[in-house]
């Protein structure tokens, strides 16, 4: 017997969202379907009963999967089934994870698996904006401990109006695209891209999103109450010893505070912190440590956190000795590698990015074949974070979710600065060689430098900065930190990344770990971030005042041509024969496509002569022969009555024996013309019915003195009953010996 419970959320614009539970996946700890129009997602959540031994973190795993059947498509590939997660699916997982994770109890360490599956879509509504709502609702109807609910919505500003959960079409016209995750009371997560907007405009988008989220959270609470899942399961995942906690604090805090205010570097500071806890543990036997080591590690982590936070709040001293608004020292080097088309090193403190740029042609475009997005990308950014960047001794595996997420943020920060008509496909590769905080922002800065070094005429240079927050008493006492370290990110209350030009914000990413963060604090953080990124932008402009005027010598050259749609087939040729011939003869690469009723041809090569050669051949194909013009030609075949001459690519005409010279020849052999010989010819006429070309060579030669026009050959042949000559050619044009010219 089904016990189906549902709640409907009115979006206020004629659209609604329905949350339903009790019908599908009933063996999961919690399961809901979320429906908006023809878009249907199923979210399930399952949690282990006990914590993993020795686990001191929240082992949450979020999976988001889109089925190709949702839109009535077959997957690509040999197996014709869904494969590994796409970048889009991974990014959606991260959006959901970042909003959920802070709201699980600190002492809850059982494995939790959240699965969100797209089962139906119409290509109009965006399902990623519903994934957070679905995941939270599944937790709400379960007995898993969770201090929610939360929800996520996308807000876009289109034509000056903020729209909640816009369609794909609306998003294409938006100058603000924000994904916001929040509880009824607090913002938890923000991510988005913008077209150089002001801080106040971004904050207004967050406010609009939060109002919509409050309605969705209320609906989840009502759903949970209707289901009767108000009582959460009991758990005991941590063993505590309050006397030991006090002992760790009493014996270690003063020394930890001294290290926190010493202003030392990352590794020296880490070793000093480690020495304190090792000396504390030395007072216990191995048997005692077997019981107490895990608790000591937990309690000492709290001591480190308290020491760092108190040093900042009470004395304004940061771990590396900087003031709250101070940016770490920056050094920059451009054109640092000879091989890439552009390169730059950006180092800020102990964070360093070596970024390169590769320029490509249309054939290098990335094909994106997602369930709801089939397109080609011309601007790519890849972010790599090897273990050695933090001094870790471990193997490097494939690209992880973190790398995809950080690369996506940098990509969104820079992509609107690439001119829409830029002919090159651009790939930016950031390799993080050192990391101690805000490596994604180093990627943005190094990306700007490398693009300009490559000669990419970006609209404006972009810089980025990561902001942090230390707060207490519900935000009544707080310190905003500019250009945070890795430890300040880990031990602080906020990680707020902002990128932009001198005129406005281009991208942002924010994760908040505490309750009670007011909009006033956000405003102050954004203003401080603006001052910081403008300082960094100034350093970029000092090191590289102008974009390189031209591409580097070894970069590919690209030219574009526009031709009439009717000529596309002529340029390609049967089976691609003509376009392949152009590429073989010129050494250039030629791509052609129809755009807006025109043929757009992209010609690329390593040097200008090969491009010019290809352009010349294409112009010859699309050129319209003009009567009276002289053309260089090549004899393609010799017949008894004359020669066929190709005078433009793909265009042949008949050079009759009578038009070879002013003197008369009895046979074509007497002319000494050979197949493959190059001669100049003049176009005398174009037959209006057949389009055949009549050529002459003799009109280009000087007429002999006393020349007498001979009697027309056709009349004599007609009297003699002859079956040869021009008359027979016109009548028997299909024969191999009397073929018609190509036009």
UniProtKB/Swiss-Prot annotation:
Q: Tell me which EC number(s) this protein carries.
A: 2.7.7.8
Phylogenetic placement of the source organism: Bacteria, Pseudomonadati, Bacteroidota, Bacteroidia, Bacteroidales
Which family would the database say this protein is a member of? Belongs to the polyribonucleotide nucleotidyltransferase family.
Q: Which reaction does it catalyse?
A: RNA(n+1) + phosphate = RNA(n) + a ribonucleoside 5'-diphosphate
- Annotated function: Involved in mRNA degradation. Catalyzes the phosphorolysis of single-stranded polyribonucleotides processively in the 3'- to 5'-direction.
Q: Which organism is it from?
A: Porphyromonas gingivalis (strain ATCC 33277 / DSM 20709 / CIP 103683 / JCM 12257 / NCTC 11834 / 2561)
The primary site where this protein sits is cytoplasm
Annotated binding of Mg(2+), by residue: 489, 495
What CDD domains does UniProt report for this protein, alphabetically? Answer: KH-I_PNPase (cd02393), RNase_PH_PNPase_1 (cd11363), RNase_PH_PNPase_2 (cd11364)
| Cellular localisation | Cytoplasm
Sorted keywords for this record are: Cytoplasm, Magnesium, Metal-binding, Nucleotidyltransferase, RNA-binding, Transferase
User: Which residues lie in coiled coils?
Assistant: none
PROSITE patterns assigned: KH_TYPE_1, S1
Q: Which NCBIfam families match?
A: polynuc_phos, PRK11824.1
> Positions of the region Disordered?
704-743
One CC-aspect GO term: cytosol
The record places domain KH at 556-618
User: Which domain of life does the protein's organism represent?
Assistant: Bacteria
Gene3D superfamilies according to UniProt: GHMP Kinase, N-terminal domain, K Homology domain, type 1, Nucleic acid-binding proteins
Protein name per the record: Polyribonucleotide nucleotidyltransferase
Q: Which cofactor does it need?
A: Mg(2+)
């Amino acid at each position: 017997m089904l016990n189906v419970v549902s709640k409907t959320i009115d979006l206020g614009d004629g659209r609604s969202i329905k949350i339903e539970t009790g019908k599908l996946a009933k063996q999961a700890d919690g399961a809901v379907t979320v429906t908006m129009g023809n878009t249907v997602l199923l979210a399930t959540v399952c949690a282990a009963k006990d914590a993993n031994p020795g686990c001191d973190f929240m082992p949450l795993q979020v999976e988001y999967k889109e089925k190709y059947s949702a839109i009535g498509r077959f997957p690509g590939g040999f197996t014709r089934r869904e494969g590994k997660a796409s970048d889009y699916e991974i990014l959606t997982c991260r959006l959901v994870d970042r909003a959920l994770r802070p709201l699980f109890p600190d002492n809850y360490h059982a494995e939790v698996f959240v699965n969100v599956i797209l089962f139906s879509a119409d290509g109009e509504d965006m399902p990623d904006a519903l994934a957070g709502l679905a995941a939270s609702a599944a937790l709400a109807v379960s007995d898993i401990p969770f201090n929610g609910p939360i929800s996520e919505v996308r807000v876009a500003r289109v034509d000056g109006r903020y729209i909640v959960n816009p369609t794909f079409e609306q998003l294409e016209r938006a100058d603000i695209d924000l994904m916001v995750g929040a509880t009824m009371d607090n913002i938890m997560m923000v991510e988005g891209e913008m077209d150089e907007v002001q801080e106040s405009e971004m904050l207004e988008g967050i406010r609009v999103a939060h109002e919509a989220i409050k309605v969705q959270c209320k609906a989840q609470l009502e759903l949970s109450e209707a289901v009767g899942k108000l009582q959460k399961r009991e758990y005991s995942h941590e063993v505590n010893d309050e006397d030991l906690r006090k002992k760790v604090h009493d014996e270690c805090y003063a020394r930890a505070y001294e290290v926190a205010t010493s202003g030392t570097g990352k590794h020296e500071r880490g070793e000093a912190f480690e020495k304190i806890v090792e000396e504390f543990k030395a007072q216990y036997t191995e048997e005692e440590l077997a019981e107490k080591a895990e608790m000591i590690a937990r309690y000492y982590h709290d001591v480190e956190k308290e020491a760092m936070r108190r040093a900042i709040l009470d004395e304004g001293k940061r771990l590396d000795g900087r003031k709250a608004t101070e940016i770490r020292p920056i050094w920059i080097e451009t054109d640092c590698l000879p091989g890439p088309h552009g390169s730059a090193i950006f180092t800020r403190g102990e964070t360093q990015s070596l970024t390169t740029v590769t320029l490509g042609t249309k054939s290098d475009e990335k094909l994106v074949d997602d369930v709801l997005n089939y397109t080609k990308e011309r601007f790519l950014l890849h972010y790599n974070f090897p273990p050695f960047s933090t001094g870790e001794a471990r193997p490097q595996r494939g690209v992880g979710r973190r790398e995809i997420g950080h690369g996506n943020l940098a990509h969104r920060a820079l992509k609107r600065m690439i001119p829409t008509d830029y002919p090159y496909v651009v790939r930016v590769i950031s390799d993080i060689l050192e990391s101690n905080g805000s490596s994604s922002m180093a990627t943005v800065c190094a990306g700007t430098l490398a693009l300009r070094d490559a000669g990419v005429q970006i609209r404006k240079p972009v810089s980025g900065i990561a902001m942090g927050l230390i707060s207490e008493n519900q935000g009544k006492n707080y310190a905003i930190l500019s250009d945070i370290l890795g430890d300040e990110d880990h031990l602080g209350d906020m990680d707020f990344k902002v990128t932009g030009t001198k005129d406005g914000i281009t991208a942002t990413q924010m994760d908040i770990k505490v309750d009670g963060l007011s909009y006033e604090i956000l405003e102050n953080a954004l203003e401080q971030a603006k001052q910081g990124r403008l300082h960094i932008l100034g350093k970029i402009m000092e090191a590289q005042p102008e974009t390189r005027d031209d591409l580097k010598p070894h970069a590919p050259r690209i030219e574009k041509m526009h031709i009439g749609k009717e000529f596309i087939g002529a340029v390609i040729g049967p089976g691609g024969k003509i376009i392949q011939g152009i590429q073989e003869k010129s050494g250039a690469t030629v791509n052609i496509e129809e755009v807006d009723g025109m043929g757009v041809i992209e010609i690329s090569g390593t040097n200008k002569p090969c491009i010019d050669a290809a352009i010349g051949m294409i112009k010859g194909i699309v050129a319209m022969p003009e009567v009276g013009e002289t053309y260089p030609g090549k004899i393609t075949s010799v017949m008894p009555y004359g020669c066929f001459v190709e005078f433009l690519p793909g265009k042949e005409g008949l050079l009759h024996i009578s038009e070879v010279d002013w003197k008369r020849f009895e046979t074509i052999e007497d002319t000494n013309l050979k197949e493959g010989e190059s001669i100049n010819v003049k176009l005398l006429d174009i037959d209006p019915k057949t389009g055949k070309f009549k050529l002459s060579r003799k009109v280009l030669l000087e007429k002999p003195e006393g020349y007498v026009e001979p009697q027309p050959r056709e009349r004599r042949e007609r009297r003699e009953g002859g079956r040869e000559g021009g008359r027979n050619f016109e009548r028997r044009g299909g024969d191999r010996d009397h073929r018609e010219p190509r036009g």
